[in-house]
Amino acid sequence: DDRLSRGLGDVYKRQGDNIESLAVAEVDPKRGISRITIVTTGTPQVIEQIKLQLGKLVPVHKVADFMRGDKKIIFKEMALLKLVGNTSKRNKALKVCKKFNPVVLDKTQKSVVLQITALRREIDTVMGDLKKFGLVSVSRTGAVAMTRGSEIFK
């Protein structure tokens, strides 16, 4: 929705803050509802002001504050990692990523594309570790979040 995009930009322009990441996905096609996950930083007062401003935007239905480190919240990012190199390098790269259960999306004699899902800092670390094994390209999502247990965020 153009109104929401403009409003989001205006909120951040007024606050003078940056968006670290933004993830948008339709969650209820029948009602035309999407979930937007915005990752930003700021003092508690700045975050509260951003929440208030976002809540005033039409057609925003609900605004919630999911704090990093909150054990009741699951945070994840997804990354696609392309590596170019010989079989030995690719196998070593897979071992580096093993704890994140990498999915091999594409594999040739000279390259491999992996998908991993992890916390932002874990992906940052893996990317650093993979440079010596031929990491040549990265595409990653912004963070997404969901509450644990039976609590529903509507």
Language model region names:
Residues 1-8:
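Single conserved hydrophobic/aromatic residue that forms the stacking wall/gate
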Residues 9-35, 39-154:
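Long, contiguous binding/interaction regions
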